[in-house]
Design a protein with these regions (language model features):
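Soluble, non-membrane globular domain cores that form compact, hydrophobic packing
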Residues: 21-118, 124-196
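C-terminal motif of bacterial Sec signal peptides marking the signal peptidase cleavage site
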Residues: 16-19
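Repetitive helical segments and hydrophobic/amphipathic motifs
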Residues: 11-12
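Positively charged n-region of N-terminal signal peptides that target proteins for export
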Residues: 1-4, 8
Length: 196
């Protein structure tokens, strides 16, 4: 009886390990590599944030939420509704008068305090507007009156026709920018300024 039980347990263990190994191998072969992402470029603002967020280890991740009220996600980035210019300005610091220059947006925020980490990614309709629009985002964020602590740093970058604006605690911003740069070889930094 003990032999049968031992053989049964051993068989279950072997099948479990084989199944896990096969699943891991499938994930690696069907996943999108960083080279593919860089070669093809991002397809949406949300894709940029999801690609970066997947690079975070469990230790690097923080309590997060993303998206506008209609598209809110917990512990993940989300799409931001461009129809709500007030929320885009209030939550992400994007100047509401400039919303017409966008056709896509996504966000990732620290769930407990947005001054700790706030990131907005915006697809600009006309690439000629990118640098001027990035400067307006910077000015709009720096002109804010802060409550519940000051963010330490603001960084604005581009990935193709996308503007990535991120502000908050210096350590979290540095981690994010490193992972963004690792994900997309076309990242170009436009601004890196202290806030507090």
């Amino acid at each position: 009886m003990k032999k049968i039980l031992t053989l049964t347990i051993a068989a279950v263990l072997v099948f479990s390990l084989v199944s896990c190994a096969k699943k891991d191998k499938e994930d690696v072969t069907t996943g999108t590599s960083a080279a593919d992402v860089q070669k093809n470029g991002p397809k949406s603002a949300l894709e940029i944030l999801e690609t970066v967020w997947k690079k975070y280890s469990a230790d690097d991740k923080f309590a997060a939420m993303g998206g506008s009220e209609k598209n809110m996600k917990e512990d993940a980035p989300g799409e931001f509704d461009l129809g709500d210019a007030e929320a885009l300005d209030f939550e992400l610091g994007f100047p509401k008068a400039e919303v017409g220059k966008l056709d896509d947006a996504a966000s990732l925020l620290h769930m407990l305090n947005q001054n700790t980490f706030t990131c907005g990614v915006y697809h600009v309709k006309n690439s000629a507007d990118i640098e001027a629009l990035a400067a307006k985002i910077k000015d709009n964020i720096l002109a804010r009156n802060w409550m519940c602590g000051f963010p330490e740093k603001l960084v604005i970058m581009t990935v193709g026709d996308y503007i990535v604006s991120v502000f908050g605690a210096a350590e979290l911003i540095s981690t994010f920018t490193a992972k963004l740069t690792d994900s997309y070889g076309s990242v170009r930094q436009l601004f890196d300024v202290p806030i507090a």
